[in-house]
Amino acid sequence: ERRWDAVQVSVPNPHAVVFVESLDADVETLAQAPVVTPAAAFPDGVNVEFAERVAPGHVRMRVHERGVGETRSCGTGACAVAWVEAGDQTGSFQVDVPGGTVWVDIEPDGPLVLRGPAELVARGTVQWPRGV
């Protein structure tokens, strides 16, 4: 069993940001959905981001989204990780996720701005029951 300290961030959905030495060192453990304690800290669940510092202003990230599991990317998760990495710094932060690369711009007393590509990854059909 592994334990990590996390930083709680609201963007405004809840995130627990965990920095690790290497995302590659413990691939199997990081692929499993983490258990967050105390559960009362996040009664509606939480997205958990594992992040690795690559260089100043550059991080790699994996994310477990609440109710879904590991996903290839998470915009609010990238913002949460960049905000924690930034500390009191401003500027553009590169966040590499399994689905590609995004950038988070952080300005003093301003909003976080997420930039990056948007790609269609699936197409489907939804049937809605009559009378609903």
PLM features per residue range, with description:
Residues 79:
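Catalytic, metal-anchored helix/loop core of enzyme active sites in primary metabolism
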